[in-house]
């Protein structure tokens, strides 16, 4: 599987399986399990998708060692501030049933992105997240 090396040295698969618009838990779990069985190693979910629990169950059921998977989720705008990001991360981790996250993204450039980013940096430095980033931001919103 092809990977790209992020600035911090983390290897990320270049192809992933996203679960946007799969709200039914049983369906989501089934398709994620099948995606992992067919070779996908990057699974992309988000707090806003409402399916982190199903993704977590699929990860546990798939029979692939956790360290071979790359799991991404995203912070939604309703929690886009320092404290909200910390609490939402803890909730996502509980729903996913993971000890660490490979990539945590700010989902949209709305709200207190600076405060949320500070929280992500702290979680990264605590070893709870391997990499952090942004999603749906334009270049001038990150410069």
Q: For each of these PLM feature ranges, what is it?
A:
Residues 1-69:
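N-terminal binding-site loop/beta-alpha segment at the start of enzyme catalytic domains
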Residues 2-7, 14, 72, 88, ...:
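Short, functionally important structural connectors and interaction interfaces within domains
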Residues 13-18, 43, 69-73, 101-106, ...:
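Hydrophobic faces of well-ordered beta-strands that scaffold small-molecule active sites
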Residues 23, 80-143:
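Glycine/proline-rich, positively charged
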Residues 33, 53-57, 73, 87-90, ...:
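N-terminal, well-ordered alpha-helical segments
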Residues 41, 66, 74, 95, ...:
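Basic side chains
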């Amino acid at each position: 599987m092809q990977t790209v090396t992020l600035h911090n040295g983390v290897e990320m698969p270049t192809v992933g399986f996203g679960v946007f618009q799969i709200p039914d838990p049983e369906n989501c779990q089934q398709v994620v399990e099948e995606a992992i069985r067919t070779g996908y190693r990057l699974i992309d979910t988000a707090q806003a998708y409402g399916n982190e629990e199903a993704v977590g169950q699929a990860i546990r059921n798939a029979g692939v060692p956790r360290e071979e998977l790359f799991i991404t989720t995203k912070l939604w705008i309703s929690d886009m501030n320092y404290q909200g990001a910390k609490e939402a991360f803890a909730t996502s981790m509980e729903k996913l049933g993971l000890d660490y996250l490979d990539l945590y993204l700010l989902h949209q450039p709305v709200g207190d992105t600076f405060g949320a980013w500070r929280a992500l940096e702290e979680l990264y430095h605590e070893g709870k997240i391997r990499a952090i980033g942004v999603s749906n931001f334009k270049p001038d919103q990150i410069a």
